[in-house]
């Protein structure tokens, strides 16, 4: 009797999970190195000038991330200090030259992160990006707009003339948090890479905080 009562609930749960997966698939614009550009990217924006791929180390105290090209060569690497209140992160190129630095502002409710591009500009990102159902965010210092699904990092980046700079897509069902960056303006490569790595670290911190909160809640029950 109990099994018969629970069967419809089980079916509804399966339908719900499949629905979420299908919805996430419609937002995903990821493609692996060597694969053709996502057909939606191609139809909407044409062939990108180049594609880059980020991959987070599975077990790393320094939150290491490699950024590789279409031939799987590492072109950038990011690493965070192990003991740092500001979560200081450095991005270096293949010649170990610093490309950008990222720091979190202390005592900020919005978890503001400052990004400095070497030889370029400085700007900030905040956790306001991850508001529920908020699909658009402007980086005031750059005049750029991010539009899409920030909670899973599937978004399009536009400049102040509404031209596409890059399209970022997350790989579904990956333990290493892999992302594809289709670049349409290679002159902004370092800035785009810094934005994606900052958002990756912010998203991971958000997930860890949610897990910690959930664990604490369960322990108190």
Could you say what each language-model-derived stretch is?
Residues 4-10, 15, 19-88, 94-97, ...:
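Low-complexity or membrane-interfacial segments used for flexible interactions
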Residues 78-79, 101-105:
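Tandem-repeat architecture and repeat-register "anchor" residues
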């Amino acid at each position: 009797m109990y099994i018969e009562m629970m069967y419809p609930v089980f079916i509804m749960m399966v339908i719900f999970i499949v629905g979420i997966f299908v919805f996430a698939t419609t937002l995903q614009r990821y493609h692996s190195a060597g694969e053709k550009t996502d057909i939606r990217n191609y139809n909407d924006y044409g062939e990108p000038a180049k594609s880059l791929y980020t991959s987070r180390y599975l077990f790393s105290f320094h939150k290491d991330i490699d950024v590789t090209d279409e031939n799987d060569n590492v072109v950038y690497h990011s690493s965070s200090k192990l003991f740092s209140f500001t979560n200081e992160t450095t991005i270096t190129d293949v010649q170990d030259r610093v490309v950008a630095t990222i720091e979190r502002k202390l005592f900020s409710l919005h978890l503001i992160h400052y990004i400095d591009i070497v030889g370029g500009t400085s700007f900030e990102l905040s956790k306001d990006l991850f508001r529920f159902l908020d699909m658009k965010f402007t980086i005031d210092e750059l005049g750029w707009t991010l539009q899409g699904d920030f909670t899973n990092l599937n978004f399009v980046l536009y400049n102040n003339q509404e031209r596409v700079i890059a399209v970022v897509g997350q790989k579904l069902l990956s333990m290493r948090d892999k992302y594809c960056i289709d670049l349409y303006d290679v002159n902004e490569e370092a800035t785009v890479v810094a934005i994606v790595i900052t958002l990756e670290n912010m998203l991971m911190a958000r997930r860890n905080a949610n897990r910690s909160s959930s664990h604490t809640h369960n322990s108190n029950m």
